[in-house]
């Protein structure tokens, strides 16, 4: 068995995602969520959760910011609200959320998603043994390493299978500083059209700025059609699509294609090649599935 999850932009996406075979819909909140696709109020999340449950789907909320001491009380209050709403899952990055959720008897809803930190079985098992629902493996490890970890871990593991990967976060508002240095005014709010280019590379790396700072993403779009069956066979049951930089229609179609591959209706390799042709400007890639991030390029 496997489950597909993806973030939504608006409540109208829920029926669309249901029809595409997505099992869990992620919601983001202002202040609490890093790099959101769409942002929702608590009232909208409550409404969305009820609709999802009617459709036999699950709701998840991203509490993925790092909390300072003065912000922990707001985190506790939000956790209490989400518990009352009967939200199914809560993604977290800061372990303060784990402690607060423990005090509120809701650890079983948590999914630990620290981006790069879960790189071995001991890491994953430690957090799962705290009684949380699941752990997201680092997106910078290889497929072979993911399979090796899954063979040793008892509990729910999640892997990000598709989309642009976050590669850098700074609390500083770097884009604002850049445009101030240039003496130019520029609307940066919800602007997903900016990118960086290295002098010696052709890749476009998306860069965004929000209330949590500046975020830079990979110059490629991860595409794992040819890998997902091996991951599921190894015991990884939760597969997530990164919705950012995709429309909700694209997210839904991508989910359909993954489900077709996983259920044997389409070839993973053929689907990967089709996406390369369909999205020539997105640098469709297997990412780090076969390439260690520690690999050093040597000029010959």
Report each predicted region and the residues it spans.
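As written
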Residues: 131-132
